[in-house]
Amino acid sequence: MPWTVEFHDDFEPEFLALESAVQDALLAVAKLLADYGPQLGRPYADTLKGSKHRNMKELRFEASDGEWRVAFAFDPRRQAILLVAGDKSGGSQKRFYRRLIARADKRFSAHLDRLKARKKER
């Protein structure tokens, strides 16, 4: 069963601003996520520690001399939502993950709030 993988609305313009090599590599691991869903593991995906969402994970890939991470989570519809990406090479890993997780948490919380609001409208 193929899994649905979506870009968060705020992530889409950020994705389009990335170098084409990074876009291609990200789409390749997103395809793996669509094929394997939550079963996708290392070296392509791993759990993010420190998130307020227990199901927050990261896609992992290398492109353009960088070590890229994309925070994502599966929502209640069982769809993977790609939230934010960043190159973790050349800097404080702790600071990188703190910033990545903060942005991912904010975006995923907003996504969940929108889903709840839509459900109430029905």
Language-model segments: residues:
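Basic, Lys/Arg-enriched alpha-helical interface segments
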Residues: M1-E67, P76-A80, D87-R122
